[in-house]
């Protein structure tokens, strides 16, 4: 099967290598000419994922060349670039391939999920792939399980057959809204978990943040049409665990730096790659206001990131809120 992967960051590189191992004909598209020259000459993508890129994987900066005759096109760019790449795809598309989206985020200007953005430009079936999946582990063939979601279950089944092997297991879920929101909103909680670590707090604090974070993710998700059970699955609890606890998580690492006293700008500069949770915090905060949903952790992280609130004061605000029942609002 010919599969195109658009975006040569960590996840795009990892999924391209994984699919090449399965015997598919892979084309990896990128737009950065310097990165293109580096990969072509060294077969390494040093900035993002410094592993050998097999010679069988074609590398190109020509989008039309990349997607021509592809049966599946994987969008593996950051969430802020999904609209641009979708618009470009509309201009070059010549067949009804399945789109697989890997980006996890909510567009800040429109508050739309990534599949909604893609569908503005393409009539193709869109399959969302989400779950606990560090690229660094997938590329090393460490056992990983994720979830696929689409309005067309048949499209999910085609992707499931094409992507699965003994080290990469995929489940199907019909709840596109929940799967996308779980994958996006957990990055906010991971920033909070990192801030907690940076402040020197312990496991109790992180466990509380993760659990109460899941509660507010679920509240917003249900208000937007999700099945609450989705957030107990791989796109919810699964992704939340790995992103809040692993040092491979950019969101957690950025949070640690902020907890240690660095500004948001300094933290992002030190990470050197996209930290999706920052923009998602803006989007989720606005969604919570529009839908009148209580999201106290998101509110405090927003205040830390964009209003200069001291993290210790944010913790105090959370710990001294009015008394609640645990399942309030769910």
UniProtKB/Swiss-Prot annotation:
Q: Where on this chain does NADPH bind?
A: 10-11, 31, 104, 135, 250, 274, 276
| Pfam families linked to this entry | NAD_Gly3P_dh_C, NAD_Gly3P_dh_N
**Chief place where the protein resides:** cytoplasm
Locate the residues binding sn-glycerol 3-phosphate. Answer: 104, 131, 133, 186, 239, 249-251
* Gene3D superfamilies in the cross-refs: N-(1-d-carboxylethyl)-l-norvaline Dehydrogenase, domain 2 (1.10.1040.10), NAD(P)-binding Rossmann-like Domain (3.40.50.720)
What is this protein identified as?
Glycerol-3-phosphate dehydrogenase [NAD(P)+]
Q: Name one GO cellular component term.
A: cytosol
Query: What is the catalytic activity of this protein?
Result: sn-glycerol 3-phosphate + NAD(+) = dihydroxyacetone phosphate + NADH + H(+); sn-glycerol 3-phosphate + NADP(+) = dihydroxyacetone phosphate + NADPH + H(+)
Which cell locations does it reside in? Cytoplasm
Tell me yes or no: is ATP-binding among this UniProt entry's keywords: no
Q: Which residues form the active site?
A: 186
Question: Pathway of this protein?
Answer: Membrane lipid metabolism; glycerophospholipid metabolism
InterPro entries for this protein: 6-PGluconate_DH-like_C_sf (IPR008927), 6PGD_dom2 (IPR013328), G3P_DH_NAD-dep (IPR006168), G3P_DH_NAD-dep_C (IPR006109), G3P_DH_NAD-dep_N (IPR011128), NAD(P)-bd_dom_sf (IPR036291)
Coiled-coil intervals, chain numbering: none
As recorded in Swiss-Prot or TrEMBL, the protein's gene is named gpsA
UniProt keywords, alphabetically: Cytoplasm, Lipid biosynthesis, Lipid metabolism, NAD, NADP, Nucleotide-binding, Oxidoreductase, Phospholipid biosynthesis, Phospholipid metabolism
Q: Write out the function statement from the record.
A: Catalyzes the reduction of the glycolytic intermediate dihydroxyacetone phosphate (DHAP) to sn-glycerol 3-phosphate (G3P), the key precursor for phospholipid synthesis.
- Biological process per Gene Ontology, one example term: carbohydrate metabolic process
User: Which family does the UniProt entry place this protein in?
Assistant: Belongs to the NAD-dependent glycerol-3-phosphate dehydrogenase family.
